[in-house]
Amino acid sequence: MPLRLQNKLALVTAAGQGIGRAIAEMFASEGARVIATDLDDKKLEGLKSLKRRKLDVRSTASVDSFAHEIATELGALDVLVNCAGYVHQGSVLDCSEHDWDFSFDLNVKSMHRTIKAFVPDMLGKQAGSIVNISSAVSSIRGVPDRYVYGATKAAVIGLTKAVAADFIKKGIRANAICPGTIESPSLEERIKDRSRATGKSLAEVEKAFVERQPMGRLGHAEEVAALAAFLASDEASYITGQAHLVDGGMAL
């Protein structure tokens, strides 16, 4: 059976851990030529990829320069996966101006930067798939203490639909993936933060996370990566502008 992403050139941001790394690994296993980036390039060590590079997606100059480098060396991307993100915990009362600005810059504007930088070359060949990581906590569902995070992830869905509409007749598709609670280093840090804030043990906090899941378990990054591989592939050629849940029934 042929590999579904054979020879496709794919860029994955925040590929050093969690969902981003799982996507980069799955893409490589499906035959893609993966360009893996992360702000901490040490996290990219051991990752099978065509190119590994430190990239600050909050810097327009860095993203533009990197896009020019890739276009010159390798040509237009076939797939762009935007994974970089940050989870702020708290309500509107806990959200400072800095928290708001940082969250929107990393969770939303970073996607604007990469899409704006890489889409022109995709347009040149009238083909490309963009996959943006949003969340079930967004315009789909409100969750306590995810005020600015939910707002940013709702914005990601809106951004994705806008890009899909703009380029729907030019060969470029854009879709959003909306994970529920996924086992990852990011979740581990949130559990630690919650434990410190509440005085509860790590086991108690983790148990509470699991008990909130309709399926009675947390999701796995590989389950998100499987959907990303499908959306990036030609098998999904008639799918664009959608928010796809991988949430174990969280949004039911």
What spans do the regions from the language model cover?
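Conserved NAD(P)H cofactor-binding loop of Rossmann-fold oxidoreductase domains
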Residues: 84-88
